[in-house]
Structures are given as C-alpha cells and as structure tokens.
Amino acid sequence: MVVGAFPMAKLFYLGIRQVSKPLANRIKDAARRSEFFKTYICLPPAQLYHWVEMRTKMRIMGFRGTTIKPLNEEAAAELGAELLGEATIFIVGGGCLVLEYWRHQTQQRNKEEEQRAAWNALQDEVGRLALALEALQAQAQAMPSLSALEELREELQEVRGQVCNAHCTSKCQAASSKK
C-alpha cells in the first residue's frame, strides 16, 4: 500500500486556526480591561453593529422611523470584544484560505511549466527525427536501384566476355570462371 505525502501545509493551517481561538479570547480579555481598547476599538463597531441589527429587526417587524437607543458602555464593550474576537478568527481563517489558494496556484503553475517543457522537448525530438528521416530518404534516393546494379553487372560480364574473346587468353577465362 502506497502512502501519499502528508499535507504538512494543511496541518500547519489547522494549527494556526486552533491557536487563533485562544488568541481571540486573550484579545477579548485585553479589550475588556484596557480603557483605550474599549473606547476606540470596541465601542464604535459594537454601537454600529447594534444600530444595524436593531434597525433591521424593526423594519422586519414593520416599525419604521423609530429611534434606536445606543447600548450602554458595559454591553457595548462586551459586544465589541466579541466582535473583535470573531473578526480575529475570521481574518486568520481567511488568511489561511488565501495562503492555501496561493500555494495551490503555485503548484499548478509549476506543473503546467513542467508539462510545457516536456511538450517542447518532445516537439524538438520529433523535429530532429523528421530531419534525420529526410536525410535517410535523400540517401536512399541517391543510391542506385537494385535493377540498375543488375544491369551494370550484366554489362560488366559482356565487356569481360568481349575482352576474353578478343584476347583468348587463359587468364581471362580463369577470371571469368571464378565469377
């Protein structure tokens, strides 16, 4: 049984997401304790969230034009801290998704480049083989055909026969009998 490579990147992202929850809880605790954090970071988003939520609920129930009272500071700080914690988890999760997408795109791009390089190498090899084939075909056409060789052999024997008849020497007869 072949075991594939363990996806270390996915394990790393899962670890980051698991660490983000306690991190969000620490941020919430710090937001509750720090006056600056509470006043400038937690309260404005909490009041805005409360206003949008209440306005939406009022419109759904059919009440229009009613004024919405802002949350008291304690409730707004609590809601702001919760929103901040959830935003932290969301941002970490979104960051992990973006990193995973980027990693996948990089792998895909590398794979396509490898395929393109292999394709180009195959095309080069086919071109080289086509040139070699053309050269071999040209050599084959330049060579005399088998029937032409037979004709030349017959002419050679006729010439030998004529030379032998003309000189009638024993050497010529011996030479023609060897062939």
From Swiss-Prot:
Record carries keyword Mitochondrion: yes
Gene Ontology biological process terms from the UniProt entry: bone development; fat cell differentiation; mitochondrion organization; neuromuscular process; regulation of growth; regulation of lipid metabolic process; visual perception
Keyword annotations: Coiled coil, Mitochondrion
Keyword Coiled coil: yes
InterPro entries in UniProt: OPA3-like
Chief localization: mitochondrion
Pfam families registered for this protein in UniProt: OPA3
Gene Ontology cellular component terms for the protein in this record: mitochondrion
Subcellular location: Mitochondrion
Coiled-coil regions listed in the entry: 120-143
Function: May play some role in mitochondrial processes.
Family per similarity comment: Belongs to the OPA3 family.
Identification of the protein by name: Optic atrophy 3 protein homolog
